[in-house]
């Protein structure tokens, strides 16, 4: 936090206002991948309900073996779409067969992890970057594809839009602690500081 505060005065103010931030970690990489697919395009409440059903169906622990023991109908009965069932079963088979070595991912650089994960069905760049932060505990990840990160940047730095060039400038400024900066940007986007989003300003009407 001290380093980020020295690098960026506005972020320093945010850090002082919010104080320490903590986020839930996903220590099991397979569980993180499957739960990420389960939650895609769902509200938090719906995703939690379906995930709980999947866990119960798998005997309380979602592993490649317990997941593959369930047929498609059983997983559909938990609330998963046919496409999501196909995704999670494919990933389970990849891990169970050894084609995907999850332990090896911890030894790879960030870009290589993203490349490996995005080759899996249902895993995009954003999901891979969240895995980097919350499962592999990588210290320097700021996701351009995260809408809340964009919102937090707009709110902190008073921009109407965040293009790639502007995003990269901030990302470089936060390095090598981009993941910590991400936590604060998410907190800001969630209303922790009471800032408004410049992108949501109502344009002033012109006089006739």
Region annotations inferred by a language model:
Residues 30-34, 47, 68-71, 109-113, ...:
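N-terminal alpha-helical segment
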Residues 36, 52, 115, 151, ...:
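Active-site phosphate/pyrophosphate- and oxyanion-stabilizing loops and adjacent acidic/basic residues
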Residues 25, 45-49, 62, 66, ...:
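Alpha-helix N-cap and coil->helix boundary residues
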